UniProtKB/Swiss-Prot annotation:
GO molecular function, one term: 3'-5'-RNA exonuclease activity
Protein name: Oligoribonuclease
SMART domains for this protein: EXOIII
Organism of this sequence: Xylella fastidiosa (strain Temecula1 / ATCC 700964)
Swiss-Prot/TrEMBL keywords: Cytoplasm, Exonuclease, Hydrolase, Nuclease
Class of this enzyme: hydrolase
GO biological process: DNA metabolic process
Keyword Amino-acid biosynthesis carried by entry: no
Primary location recorded for the protein, binned into one broad class: cytoplasm
Record bears the keyword Cytoplasm: yes
HAMAP family referenced in this protein's UniProt entry, alphabetically: Oligoribonuclease
Family membership: Belongs to the oligoribonuclease family.
Record-linked Pfam families: RNase_T
């Protein structure tokens, strides 16, 4: 449990999360995949949480726009969702149970890329999980936008290898933040580890 860890150590842990959804409309669309990873403040992976495809009927998947239909078929998520027996409540409870082993409630910002969208979906479909996070976000896409404004050449070193599944997107986000830390850290006077 987190209580056994030194407070300083556990308070600096970061929870990375990614969702795949049927679309971007938070009122109409639904979460179909969730994954989490816990890192320390230096972005070293400490633990990989459960990765769930969330059960939805075929008619929900067929109602997705063309981009989502193609992407989720190509990644294999389409079939995983159809084969899954996991519901939102189960995925939420299991994810919280995993996080409780690593990070205290409210101690970590929500970390990832374009994380505000994930937070909106969690608020509606997994509210207990959304409340597990601190109200702040660590959004890697903010650094991407700043790099594009201030030093576009930094973006040349960003390599995405993801297959647009939740877990692979998390690892891409962590790698991207490592790249910005290395590239922008010296510019900002930060030590580069």
């Amino acid at each position: 449990m987190v209580a056994e860890l030194p407070v300083v150590e556990s308070d600096r842990r970061l929870i990375w999360i990614d969702l795949e959804m049927t679309g971007l409309d938070t009122h109409r669309d639904s979460i179909i995949e969730i994954a989490t990873v816990v890192t320390d403040a230096q972005l070293n992976v400490l633990a990989e949480g459960p990765e769930f495809a969330i059960s939805h009927p075929l008619n929900v998947l067929e109602a997705m726009d063309e981009w989502n239909r193609n992407q989720h078929r190509h990644s294999g998520l389409w079939q995983r969702v159809l084969n899954s027996e996991i519901q939102h409540a189960q995925a939420e409870a299991s994810t919280i149970a995993f996080l409780q082993q690593w990070v205290k409630i409210g101690a970590s910002p929500m970390c990832g890329n374009s994380i505000c969208q994930d937070r909106r979906f969690l608020h509606r479909q997994m509210p207990c999980l959304e409340r597990y996070f601190h109200y702040r976000n660590l959004d890697v896409s903010t650094l991407k936008e700043l790099a594009g404004c201030w030093s576009p050449s930094i973006l040349d070193g960003v390599v995405k290898t993801s297959s647009h599944t939740a877990l692979s997107d998390i690892y891409d986000s962590i790698a991207e933040l490592r790249h910005y830390r290395k590239s922008m850290g010296t510019f900002a006077g930060l030590s580069v580890v």
